[in-house]
Amino acid sequence: MTYLDKILEHKRKEIEALKPQNFKKQFESQAENLPAPRDFAAALRRKAPSEPLRLIAELKKASPSRGVMVHDFKPLEIAERYRTLGASAYSVLTDEEFFQGHANYLKAVRENFDLPVLRKDFIIDESQIYEARLLGADALLLIVAALSPEALLQFRELAESLGMSALVEVHSKPELDIAVACGATIIGVNNRDLRTFKVNIQTSVELFASYPNDVIAVSESGIKTPEDLQQLADAGFDAVLIGEGLITSERLAAYGWNEK
């Protein structure tokens, strides 16, 4: 069983346990009082090749491959640090079992900062999309490897109908083709293979050649040096999603994120 299989197996049980909360019904009763979503797509698009990559700064306490990375995890303090670095958006892990994230982390960041916030989780049921909107998410992650093409299309359309953006994640050319066919306007290449958790940044570089011109291009995971960033910028990416590297690498933190 792969890492992804284990995560999805647990996620199905988790969703079943949460069904009585009926997030769709909650959303329908609260919709008029929810704050309008922020424009995640506009925050990510580079307007010219001379501009620096946009930064989606990720708040991540732990991962299946690394264990706990931030023992004294204070989401608001981390979010403030990322803001001063020049982040364009936040990514907040809400998976509890494998990444020690929490829905309350997303809610707190959204309520205390002005940047768009992405819900980073394994979305496999429409109830999670309504929950994301209730939490204040401006965007959510849809992973091609975790969904059928039909579910991917359905979930993207539902997210957008609720005012959120969908960051559709791929790891291969066939997955990219599926993302494009489903009408994705923001496509991220995960340099980490979710089946093995091995990382190769060249995955992004190789797949970019197959991107449609009008799609916002994001590279995710394994970005460790300014040289990595330059390679991705030269390839044509709009944005990168980085978490651990911003904490562990002063050179990454010093990249000209503020020079927009």
Swiss-Prot record:
It catalyses: 1-(2-carboxyphenylamino)-1-deoxy-D-ribulose 5-phosphate + H(+) = (1S,2R)-1-C-(indol-3-yl)glycerol 3-phosphate + CO2 + H2O. GO terms for biological process: L-tryptophan biosynthetic process. Its EC number is 4.1.1.48. Pathway: Amino-acid biosynthesis; L-tryptophan biosynthesis; L-tryptophan from chorismate: step 4/5. Gene3D superfamilies: Aldolase class I. It comes from the Bacteria. GO terms for molecular function: indole-3-glycerol-phosphate synthase activity; phosphoribosylanthranilate isomerase activity. Pfam families: IGPS (PF00218). Keywords: Amino-acid biosynthesis, Aromatic amino acid biosynthesis, Decarboxylase, Lyase, Tryptophan biosynthesis. InterPro entries: Aldolase_TIM, Indole-3-glycerol_P_synth, Indole-3-glycerol_P_synth_dom, Indole-3-GlycerolPSynthase_CS, RibuloseP-bd_barrel. NCBIfam families: PRK00278.2-4. Belongs to the TrpC family. This is Indole-3-glycerol phosphate synthase. It comes from Chloroherpeton thalassium (strain ATCC 35110 / GB-78). The lineage of its organism: Bacteria, Pseudomonadati, Chlorobiota, Chlorobiia, Chlorobiales. The gene is trpC.
